[in-house]
Amino acid sequence: MSREQQLIDLLYKEVVPAEGCTEPVALAYCAAKTRDVLGHIPDRIDVFASGNMIKNVKSVTVPNSGGMIGIEASVAMGTIAGNAAKELMVISGVTKADLPKVQEYLQKDCIKVFNASKPIKLYIRIEAYYKQDKVIVEFKYTHTNITLIKKNDEIIYEVDDADNKSNLVDEIISKFSIKEIYKIASHLDTSKISDMLDKIVKDNSNISNEGLVHQYGIQTGRNIRSGIDNGFYGDDIRNRAAAAASAGSDARMGGSALPVMTAAGSGNIGLTLSLPLIEFAKSKGKSQEELYRALFFAIVSTVYIKSSIGRLSALCGPTCASAGIAGGLAMMLDLSEDKVEKSIINALAGIIGIMCDGANSSCSIKIANSVYAAFDAVNAAMLGNTVTPHDGIVGDDVEGTIKNIAILATGKGMNETDDAILGVMTGRLADICK
């Protein structure tokens, strides 16, 4: 298989539709799968989730739930009314008529949640019981990656951990570089990926418009648009792009049932990457081919950067997307390869370090800041200005910078930060910091 085809295949594996925040719907998917294997609505469910999963489910609204939040609500939605065949669209078919049954199940207090205390940042295990039967379904590493299905003493499905990791997107993309991804994107026949990119433009634009028209969360997108309208902000592409991206997150975190095309396992990253480039292309009269090359490069390069950090971490995911936006903008501006890389370096140097305090309404603020950082990074690179190597976390080049960020993100200090954030969010900071 050619290197180009590997990246095309990776794009189709990586960019998938999801309704709502990916962590709650992943739990709903796991719960629906568990119920299907059990063959009954469970009498009792024990949920074991990694700290990062708990962090990202605590504060967001579950789509189609009538405003419910939390792990128990996500699991109950999947158990009572989820369709496991739809994966991350598992609860897209839930109606108002289903909600009384979901509420009734929650009132039984039969769902218990435990911190799995695993080194794996993205981990879910659901153990469900019905009379004498017990089913275990386990997910690792990604939101749809089933690694174990067991009913009573029978292992129905199991994947060896080493073999499983070698087939994951993160392992595949790690064998590339920003330079190679750029070269492939520059010469790619975009007709090979147009169906996927058509869907990205359509779905992500739809939820952005939803967030601009209706009131969700802190309304960051609407706030920026209002600032443009009343003259507090300038009516320019930088502000319009920030409004578009953050509005999509407002709607998504606020429980909109509209689908989002994800990237790097995150709908917010998918929105952050795509909407500024769509707005820029529209504003500057760029061709569909120019936009699609930029989207391909932005998505794949962000997956590459995120692969060294992890799907879930103490670092805010959309800040990695800032680098992808910068690369995509630089490509649409037909800047040199050197300036494309310098745009990415500037973005990473300027925005990386924002912590992830779980999926919540403030994600849209972080997304707006990530978009602003991307535009500023490209402007600086166009003017010949780049953060000097070895200033802070910046390495000799773009690869060295990404490597340094990976060290920062995966080290002991950041793991302790993650624990402290979770402690603050769950009211257990004193216990965690002992």
UniProtKB/Swiss-Prot annotation:
GO terms for molecular function: L-cysteine desulfhydrase activity. Pfam families: SDH_alpha. GO terms for biological process: L-cysteine catabolic process to pyruvate. InterPro entries: Ser_deHydtase-like_asu, UPF0597. Belongs to the UPF0597 family. This is UPF0597 protein Fphi_1065. It comes from Francisella philomiragia subsp. philomiragia (strain ATCC 25017 / CCUG 19701 / FSC 153 / O#319-036). The lineage of its organism: Bacteria, Pseudomonadati, Pseudomonadota, Gammaproteobacteria, Thiotrichales.
